[in-house]
A protein has these predicted regions:
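Membrane-embedded helix-loop-helix hairpins and adjacent transmembrane boundary segments
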Residues: 1-492
């Protein structure tokens, strides 16, 4: 069966459901905008987010088009071993950040009014240069991350309507820009609750449909074995998942989430420590459950659908071929939700990097909060347009782009952890660690000779070690922040 034969457009049901869904999201953004009274509301909900909002918003922002399209698409060519890409890491991706940095961030955020990652790093290291470094890095890496999500919208529109992918890219981009521009973090987190719930439902339904299409577990496994026995064993087809890469993925999608600004900021939005720990239980359950089922569906799809145009299409095609068009469209909205919930969180965070961390702290130190809020809406539109352009040109697969962007921001784990646990960490040490870390990451990723030195582990492993050494060495020979700053961060 060829790819063109697999795609069976059903545009009317798809448009009906999607327009209704996007209309609801737009209304929530408008409503949230009416309730957004100050800059604290816009960026972190004034630190009032409860258990349900915090837990679901964290996991729905962490999970993305990559989880629902890119990762299953990668697994589609690997088999069961591919599920190790993110399922094990999902267990720890809220627990580790909460235990290592969450409690302290909530306390500091409420006490000193921190709204962004740059607020924390700038204050901890007593250096406004940190704002500039973080702001530039966020623009460089988070725009591609948003672009990966919006590419997924194009894939979905193409599968369900037969229209070019750019139509879905532009449509989704406009809706997200509108509700983030008007509602900020309040709009983002309110929509995240709906989107996260829909994502869980989509994972469950897709998994069930994939089993039915494949004729049950036994038949699916028999088919996989007849196609390629490697689908059933480690390291998977083409040796994709050796033990070094397996360990890398567990650490990558759990420990290194601490360096993601859009997730880091979620701690400032939480009401208190009790809320955080309850939110961890809720969010972790949602992540593990959703990741397991949607990725397993990708494996099941190998047995029932072959020769598709793009591997990223496997989940939409399972829903399209296995369900009534209207029902399929409802659950495909869950995949759209996965992308939107990630984009909105990142877009608000990136806007904050430009308006607060670069403009208010470096360019115009006298700018009022009202001026920053007005500028934020303009910046949201500009960044959104850049993301749409990125999505239209599609420089790589959803999974590849996501992994690149995530890895780049993960370098900030070094200044964050040293800032929280080592009093002698300095601003110059932090900045040097990030710069050297980014250069090392690019070398370990792009240069085959250097990449071989990682011995099969992800580039972030040696990169983090190098960045940590740079942090320690440079800090030893540079001036520490004032004692007042140290006391403010280590006596809370």
């Amino acid at each position: 069966m060829n790819g063109a034969a697999v795609i069976q457009p059903a545009p009317i049901p798809f448009y009906t459901v999607l327009v209704l869904y996007l209309g609801i999201m737009a209304f929530i953004g408008w409503y949230a905008g009416r309730k957004t009274n100050n800059i604290g509301d816009f960026f972190v909900l004034s630190g009032k987010a409860g258990v349900v909002v915090s837990g679901i918003a964290y996991f729905s922002t962490q999970f993305s088009m990559g989880t629902f399209l890119g990762t299953p698409g990668t697994i589609y060519g690997v088999g069961y071993a591919g599920m190790a890409i993110s399922v094990p890491g999902a267990v720890f991706c809220m627990i580790l950040p909460a235990l290592l940095i969450g409690r302290k961030l909530i306390t500091l955020g409420h006490k000193y009014g921190f709204l962004t990652m740059a607020d924390y790093l700038t204050d901890r290291y007593h250096s406004k240069k940190m704002s500039g470094v973080l702001g530039v890095m966020m623009l460089f890496f988070l725009v591609p991350m948003m672009g990966a999500q919006i590419i997924g919208a194009g894939v979905i529109v193409h599968v369900f309507t037969g229209l070019p992918e750019w139509v879905g890219v532009v449509g989704m981009g406009i809706i997200v820009i509108l509700y983030c521009m008007t509602g900020g973090m309040k709009g983002a987190m309110m929509t995240d609750v709906i989107q996260g719930s829909l994502m869980i439902a989509t994972a469950v339904v897709t998994f069930i449909v994939s089993i039915v299409m494949g004729g049950g577990f036994s038949n699916i496994n028999h088919t996989l074995q007849s196609m390629n026995e490697a689908y059933l064993t480690f390291p998977g087809a083409n040796g994709y998942m050796p033990w070094t890469y397996y360990i890398s993925n567990i650490v990558l999608w759990s420990f290194f989430t601490m360096g993601q600004p859009h997730l880091f900021t979620k701690f400032f939005a939480m009401k208190d420590h009790k809320t955080m720990f309850k939110a961890i239980l809720l969010g972790t359950a949602g992540m593990f459950f959703s990741a397991t089922l949607i990725e397993w569906a990708g494996v099941n799809g190998i047995a029932s659908i072959q020769n598709i145009e793009k591997a990223d299409q496997i989940i939409p095609m399972i829903l399209q071929r296995g369900m009534n068009p209207f029902l399929a469209s409802i659950f495909i909205a869950g995949i759209v939700a996965a992308g939107m919930s990630t984009i909105d969180g990142i877009l608000v965070t990136t806007t904050g990097a430009v308006t607060r961390d670069i403009y208010q702290k470096i360019i115009n130190k006298n700018a009022t909060d009202e001026a920053v809020m007005s500028l934020s809406k303009v910046v949201t539109v500009i960044i959104g347009i850049v993301v749409i352009c990125f999505g239209v040109f599609q420089p790589g697969s959803i999974f590849e782009i996501n992994l690149f962007a995530f890895s780049g921001m993960a370098i900030f784990v070094v200044p964050i952890l040293f800032g929280i646990y080592w009093k002698k960490a300095t601003a110059k040490g932090a900045i040097a660690s990030v710069i050297v870390g980014i250069i090392s990451l690019l070398l370990f990723t792009l240069n085959p000779s250097v990449k071989a030195l990682a011995m099969g582990f992800h580039a972030l492993f040696p990169t983090t070690i190098i960045a940590s050494i740079v942090m320690i060495v440079v800090s030893k020979f540079t001036k520490t922040p004032p004692q007042e700053t140290i006391d403010r961060h280590f006596t809370v």
